Amino acid sequence: RFKYIKIKNGGVCNARNKGIDLAAGVYILPLDADDKIGEDYLKLAIKRLVENPTLKVVYCNAEKFGTHNRTWKLKPYSISNLAKDSMIFCSAVYRKRDWERIGGYDVNMVEGLEDWEFWIALLKGGDDVEKIDSVQFHYRVKQDSRNKKLNDESKKKLFNYMSVKHADFFIKHNVDVSKNFDEVI
């Protein structure tokens, strides 16, 4: 059921892509080693994906734990909200064929924001997303997390890259990511 794969450190996108490429299953749930999921999460998410073939992503309510414990207040999902911010965390469930369709996680997103870029690539066609109304994801907050270390210069670089790569998407939703990067995420 589980395989241990050892690869040279090439960033989270490279590791996820390698693992997903080798995965034999139909459904994917990326899970970082320090996070946790509820025991019913996979069952609930896969049930929804099976029942609705047009559904692309299933995620859930979440809470943060570690340096502080609290409910993670995620904005409601809409395609226009996705253009401004990421409200879907890394451990949402989707079909492997959709990962293949978009070419996986972008390995250029080494410094961060890879999940937001991935969800834009996957969902920019306006596809369906469903949120399970129970806490099934537990995100560990650490003092030295990569996202906390992301400085303004790196953020600008990532946002500029995304604004070019997904220009059609951001234009359609009237978002200039490169100018408003401090309001995003």
Task: Please place each PLM-identified region on the residue numbering.
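Acidic donor-binding segment of Leloir-type glycosyltransferases
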Residues: R1-K6
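Glycine-rich, basic loop-to-helix element that forms the pyrophosphate-binding segment
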Residues: I7-A23
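Conserved nucleotide-sugar donor-binding
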Residues: A24-G25, C90-G103
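Short aromatic/hydrophobic "clamp" motif used to bind/position activated sugar donors
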Residues: I28
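The conserved acidic donor/metal-binding loop of glycosyltransferases
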Residues: D32-K36, N61
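Conserved donor NDP-sugar-binding/catalytic core segment of glycosyltransferases
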Residues: D40-W72
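Nucleotide-sugar-dependent glycosyltransferase catalytic core
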Residues: T71-L82, N108-E111, D127, K131-V164
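Acidic donor-binding loop at a coil-to-helix junction in glycosyltransferase catalytic cores
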Residues: E111-F118
